[in-house]
Amino acid sequence: MAQEKVTIAETDIRVSPAESGRPTCVLLAEDDRALRRFLEVVLARAGYRVVSVCDGLEAMKAALSNQIDIVVTDAVMPNLSGHELCRFVRNSPSLSHLPVIMLSALERKETTNEAEQADAFLSKPVSGESLIECIEKLLAEKSS
């Protein structure tokens, strides 16, 4: 089996507004392997540290065991959905301050009630540029 090689260009590191000197950390929860790899590369190239998981349960564990600055989650995943993950984040005293971006292939009108607790909603297919813009906007709002 051929190994996958990903080359990431050198870039400026984005420093966490919460903890100066530490790269901003994005928790990425996405069950689609190809999309997850694409977003990992996009985020790393933009200077973010990425903790990447394939389902909501792993995301919950990662959120509790890492210094996360923002959560990007798919709405529909195995084991624990993005909606349940968002509720978990909002109800956890140590995590409730984190911005959450929900990704979904469903139309926004179909998922509005479930995505209400998310800070932003992006429809799939999501471009790297729109995700980075959304992250930057939410982090700027959080630090002001």
Give each language-model segment a name.
Residues 1-25, 129-144:
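Non-catalytic signal-transmission and effector/linker regions of two-component phosphorelay proteins
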Residues 30:
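Conserved acidic carboxylate
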Residues 37-45:
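Charged docking surfaces used in two-component/phosphorelay signaling
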Residues 47-54, 62:
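Short hydrophobic/Thr-rich beta-strand motif most characteristic of the beta2 strand and flanking loop
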Residues 74:
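Active-site residues of response regulator receiver
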Residues 77, 89:
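Receiver (REC) domain active-site loop signature in two-component systems and cognate sites
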